[in-house]
Amino acid sequence: MARILLAEDDDSMRAFLSKALVRAGHEVEDVDNGLDALAMISDSGYDLLLADVVMPGMDGIELARRAAKEQPGIRVMFITGFAAVALKARDQGPTGARVLSKPFHLRELVAQIDAMLQTVGPATGKT
């Protein structure tokens, strides 16, 4: 089980993803914007940040950069529905960040998250 912070501004997508990740055995906290997500990263340790790239206030790329400074070792996965934004996230995101383009299958999301978490072990030191 991993601790995942989900930052997604679309309410239905956020609820859908959160529910799917909990069913996959992960502990999930979710927020609807980058600023709230950053505050939560400062207060708690997470294994993975799953962030939409396009959000109000602070986009997912800036959130990921700041999250990596606050919590070195956090893994980052971006989700986006825009091809150009996906390329930007891949080029400007933290080292090792992955990009998953919408639409995607939940199996694909869970498989990619599990693969990321297996690379080094949980960032928080918990299993």
Question: For the regions a protein language model found, what residue spans apply to each?
Answer:
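Charged docking surfaces used in two-component/phosphorelay signaling
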Residues: A15-R23
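Receiver (REC) domain switch/output surface
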Residues: L109-G121
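Receiver (REC) domain active-site loop signature in two-component systems and cognate sites
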Residues: M55
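Acidic catalytic/metal-coordinating carboxylates
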Residues: N33-D36, D59-L63
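Acidic, metal-coordinating helix/loop segments flanking the phosphotransfer/catalytic sites
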Residues: L5, E29-L48, K69
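Active-site residues of response regulator receiver
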Residues: D52, T80
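Conserved acidic carboxylate
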Residues: E8
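Alpha4 helix (beta4-alpha4-beta5 surface) of REC/receiver domains from two-component response regulators
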Residues: E62, R75, F82-S101, R107-A111
